[in-house]
Each structure stands twice: as C-alpha cells, then as structure tokens.
Amino acid sequence: MSNVIFSQNLYDTAQNIVDGCMGDADPACQTACPMHTDVKGYVKMAGEGDYKGALHLIRERLFLPQTLGRICAHPCEANCRRNTEFNQPISVAGIKRFVAEQADEDANWDLKVGSDTGKKVAIVGAGPAGAQAAIELRRQGHQVVIFEKLDVYGGMMRVGIPEYRLPRDVIDFEYSYLDMLGVETRFGVEIGKDIAFQALRDEYDAVVLAHGAHVGSIIPLPGHKATGVFSAVEYLKEVSETRDFPRAGKRVMVIGGGDVAMDCARSSWRIGADEVYQCSLESMENLPASQVEIDESLEEGVVFNAGWGPVSIEDKDGAVTAVTLKKVESIFDEEGNFSPKYAEETRVIEVDTVLFATGQIVADITDGAVDQTRGGRYVVDKETLASSVEGVYVAGDASGGNIVIEAMALGRKAAISIERQFAGKALTADRDFRQEYSYESRLDIPLPKGTVDVPRLHGELRDAEERKRDFKQVDFGFSAEQVKAESSRCLKCECKLCMKECIMMNDFGDCPKTLFKDFIETKDMDPKLAYSCNACDQCTVVCPKDYPMKDIFIGARPDFVKANGGESPMSGHKAIKMHQLLGFSKFFTMAKSAVNK
C-alpha cells in the first residue's frame, strides 16, 4: 500500500534500529583479518566436508591459502570468541591449510582479466604485498611488471621463513598464479642498481614500492663488531638459499624474542649447532613470538633466557667468546618510553656466534626521492599509501606492514589507489577505508546458551630430536576427522537472535537492519509484515539492545487502517465485537471459520 502515511515516530524508531542493529555485523574473525576473509563461512563448509566450496571462499580473498595455512600470524584466531572467552581459538590456519591441500588445483583458478587498458604498472618486489598488488591490477586489465632482485618468488617470506615451516614447492605452486594471470616478473633485477628508480617513473604510469625489509639491524653493544656477530636477515637468507652458514660456530646465542628469533634458533640446530641459546628483554610470558614457535623451540632444546638483556659481547682476538646478560627489571619508563633498567644479577654464556633478531629495515631504492622514517619505512599517506612522489605508492614492509596477511592487504590498498588514479578519481573521496584493512567488529552478543570450553586440536608434529637436524616439514597438519571436529568448535558468531526467535520476520528480510532500512527508504511496508506480528515480544527479549520491533509493527496498523478507509487492508479480517483492546479489534485480528471435521 503505497498511499499509507506512517507516523514519524515509526520512522524514528526504525532509524534507531538501523543505526545500531548488529544483524549485518561481520564476526570478529573476519574483521580482524586485513583481507576480510569469510572465516566463519569456510570453516563451516570445511566441517561439512565441502572442501571445494570452502576453498572457493578462501581464494576469493587469498591467493596463498597453503602458505597462510602454515605461517600466517592469524589475527583472526586472536580475535576468535573461543580465544577471548576460553583462550583456545579455532585453528583457522590449520583448517585453511587442510582445505587447500585437499582441493586447490591450478586448473580451477580464476584467470579472468579485464580488457587491456593500455596502462602499465611497475611493482618492485615479489613478496606478498607486491604479488597482491599485481593480481588486483592485472585483473583490471593493466599491464603489470614485477621487478624482483632475487631469482625466485616470495620475497622476505621466501628467504626469511625457514623451509621446515614453509616448503618451497608450496610457494612455487601458489605463486604460479601470477604467471597464469599474465603478470610479467623480471627476476634478478635490483632497482636503484640495475635500473634507476627514475627510469621506472618515466616508463610506467604508476609504481608500487613493495620491496621487503632486507637490511638487518645489529644493536651496537660493546663487542658487536667481533667476528661471529650477524644479523638475522643475513643468517636466514643464506640458510634459506644454501641450508648452511659456514661462518657460524657451534654455540649460538640469538638475541630477540619474536618469531624471527625463533626461526634463527631452530635453524641453527639444522645446520649443525651443538648449543642454542636465546635472550630477550621480554619475559617468557611476554615474548612477542607466537606460542607455537616458542613451544616448538623449547621442544627442540633451545635454552631460553627471556627477561635477561644482553649488555656486552665478549671476544678474544676479535672473535666472539661469550655474551653477558643482566636481569631485566623494566623495559619502559613511566611515560612508556623505551628505557630498559637492569638488576645487578648477571649471566655469562659462552658462545661463538651471536645473531641479532632485533629488527630490520627497508633499503631506500629511490635515491632519496621518497622520504623514509628513522625506522627505515617510506613516508606515505596511511590510508591511500600514496607517497610524496606523484604516481608512486608503497606497500608491505616498506609501508609498515608487519605480517604476511597485512602485506597482502596493503598491496591491495595500493592497487585500489592506482585504480582511482587511472580513473581520474580523488584517492579519498567516497572511499570506505575500513573495508580495506582490519577493524573492530561491531558484534557484541552473549555466548550461545550451553557454550562450554572445548580443547583446541593440533596437527601432528615430527619428533623433536629427529626434526631438528633436517629441513623437512615439521607439522603434518590436520586429518579430515580433525578438521570436522575443530570446525564444530566454531560458535558461528552472528547476532540475528531475533530472527531465530520470530516465526515471521525471516519471510521479509535478512535482519531488522535491512528490513527497516527498506521501510525508511521506500516509505512503504508490506501490510503482511505488520499484521503477521503476534506481539509476543520475543524479538525484543533476545535482542542484546532491547530494540522494540513489535512497536513498529503494531504501531503501523492504525496507519494502514486510516489509509484504507477505516478497514483492515488484510482480506479475511472479520469483526470480533467483544471487549478486546484496540490491538485485537476487528481492524487488527484475523479470524477463520472452524474446520469441520
């Protein structure tokens, strides 16, 4: 009935619901993922055995499902409700890996690209950021050329993550998508050395700087120039390429508490170390490394000195002999500034090799054309990733990304900006930046009734003493039975509690937000919606925000009656001349004759 004039009060109530309803809110696992992968969707499909369907959802966002299933820092898991409530998140990465191993075939990859636009884009670096930018731009029909100084795909992911965690054939298989899509990659070409940065600007319509942080950082402690001191970057790169590091000794100290430090420590066993130690300012409880990496390092025999900071490197005749540690009392001062304080208690650990896993920086390949911060990142607009140089964008490590999934999202963000540049659009106008990176979910609902803690499952690992002496893959991954069981732990987080209680609203919309948004925009309502409500109020009872949906439905009925000449718009309504309230009078009540039996 398009001739109904509804009261403003109904519109106001509806608008309040539209503004706050969480029915369309994505779960925290999805919003925490910088690529916004539909975690809940593919976990459900995997649990049902629909591996192809699950993989389809994954590959809509991620071209590296097997890789990420092994090495992703999985912010989705950190924000999983089972983690925030029980400290045991769903093993999202493990499920992703299994699905990809079971169902991913290059014959099924989406190779559609747009018509040739005549635009050319140069991308520096074939890591996750550069690759993602290349994929997004190539799909739009642009000619894309990647310049990679290494001879292989993967960037820092390839030379910084040991192969016992990430087999190289996995990288090669998943990166072959770029070749099939028509992206050109020129290996062994270093921008700033083999080709000048300005030459790229002159030849290409846009440039993406996506080269990783390949420069290691060594803290200038007393003795840091002694023979036997190396950066983690140098060490892991050579070990990755050769499975060896001849300059290292047999007793290794790794300085640092992150995943890179764990990789250095565990790699040291695999190239022949007899003793491997770790030290860091952070205590064992506050190490930045993932718990999996810490646990597996401990299993392999790494000796931790967490909470003990290095104060000097001892040497004899210029070669490392030991590292002196002091007990850490605090790392930051009262203002939150980095200012370590030590107790007098010391430890001296005899070693012949020291590895600094204390950070790395991005080399400037622009000859100063693009400003860099003191931390070795390029200065860019954080939302658009545009640099101060027109047509030049930055992604990945070079713009501040810290993990692979973030690098991919930044590569996509740079591609979005370039697409706008090519279309002549402003880089920021009418752009929903929230959809381009991680954000906090609006979903705030109670746990489903009867929810209990269910232990998280883990893949089978090789024996620690066996695995620590070779580079074969450590984690065998999940079985089909484990995937089914682990998927069943998902709480399927969503609101829509009212939709589960109401017997009629599902016939008219997906959730109150979409239902009432349509009402506000069209200024119209299906009378069946208003007259189907039986005023049970269960929608409001279960609503986390106590929204009065019933008030709108019941409140709309007088407006329908008024527009219909004083009669109900519903055929079949009959008068019941009794003492009921108005809400149950002839205008609002359906009546049917008794069925003769």
What do these predicted ranges mean?
Residues 99-115, 173-193, 216-271, 373-388:
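Glycine-rich dinucleotide-binding loop and its adjacent helix/turn
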Residues 189-205, 315-346:
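Conserved beta-strand-loop-beta-strand element in the redox core of flavoprotein oxidoreductases
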Residues 264-279, 405-430:
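Internal hydrophobic alpha-helix adjacent to the cofactor/substrate pocket in enzyme cavities
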Residues 142-148, 273-280:
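Short beta-strand "acidic-cap" motif of Rossmann-like dinucleotide-binding folds
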Residues 90, 161-185, 224-232, 289-315, ...:
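N-terminal glycine-rich dinucleotide-binding loop that anchors FAD/FMN and/or NAD(P) in oxidoreductases
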Residues 27-31, 40-221, 509-597:
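Iron-sulfur-cluster electron-transfer modules
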Residues 9-11, 20, 295-301, 309-319, ...:
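Mid-to-C-terminal Rossmann-like scaffold of FAD/NAD(P)H-dependent oxidoreductases
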Residues 225-250, 333-402, 409, 416:
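FAD-site-proximal beta/loop scaffold in flavoenzymes
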